[in-house]
Amino acid sequence: MHSKRGRARLDASFAMVVAGFSLLCCVSLACFFPHSMMFDGASAPLYRSFNSGFGLASFVGALAYGVAVFRFPKLFFAGALAGYAMLGAGCALLMAVVGDAWVAVTAGALCGGGLACAYVYWLGLLTFMHRRRAMTAQGGQALVGGLAFSLLSLLPLEVARIAIVAGAAVSCVCACVAWWRMRASGEASIAGLQEKGGVFS
C-alpha cells in the first residue's frame, strides 16, 4: 500500500507524464499538418517535400531507436533527448522554409525522426505503469493533444509557431523529470522497471 504522500507523488508523476505526452501529441499534429508552421501561401510541392522527408524518417527513426534500445537499454533516455533535439531543429527549419524543397525535405526528416524517438520513449514509459493508468494516459494524450492543436488554429501564425516550439520544449522537460524520478526511485534499468512493475503503478 502506498502512503498518502507516496500516492500524491505517484499522482503528480502521472499528471506530468500525461502533460508531456499530450504536448508531444500536439506538436506531432502540427507536423502532420505543417500549415500551422509554414509561411502563408506555401506551395503544394513544399508540403509534399516536407511530408516525404517526414514519413521516411519516422519509419527509420522508430526502427533505429527501438533496435538500439533493445541492444543497449541505456540509450532509452539518451535516444529520447536526441529525438527532441532533432524535433526542435526540424521545427525551426520548417518555420524558415521560404521556397526551397530540399530545406523542406530536411525539416521533414528532422521532425519525423525526432518525433519517432520521442513518441517511442513515451510509449515505453506507459509499459512501466499500471494497466489502467497506461490506458488513461494513452487516451488522455490523444484527447488533450488534439484539443490543444485545434486551439492553435485560433491563434495568429507567429503566435502558433511560438506555442508549438514551447510545447515541444515543455514536453522535453517532462520527459527529463520522468526519467529523473525513475532513477531517484532506484529503478535505473529498463529490465528492472519491467520486472518490478515500474514506479507509476
Regions found by a protein language model. Name each.
Residues 3-51, 198-201:
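Pair of pore-lining "gating" transmembrane helices in MFS-fold secondary transporters
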Residues 177-201:
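Flexible interhelical linker loops that connect adjacent transmembrane helices
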Residues 49-71:
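Central cavity-lining transmembrane alpha-helices of secondary-active solute carriers
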Residues 84-99:
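C-terminal ends and interior cores of transmembrane alpha-helices
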Residues 115-130:
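Intracellular juxtamembrane helix-capping segments at the cytosolic ends
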Residues 131-156:
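Glycine-rich segments within core transmembrane alpha-helices of 12-TM secondary carriers
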Residues 162-184:
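Symmetry-related core transmembrane helices of the 12-TM Major Facilitator Superfamily/SLC fold
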Residues 101-119:
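Hydrophobic core of transmembrane alpha-helices in multi-pass small-molecule transporters
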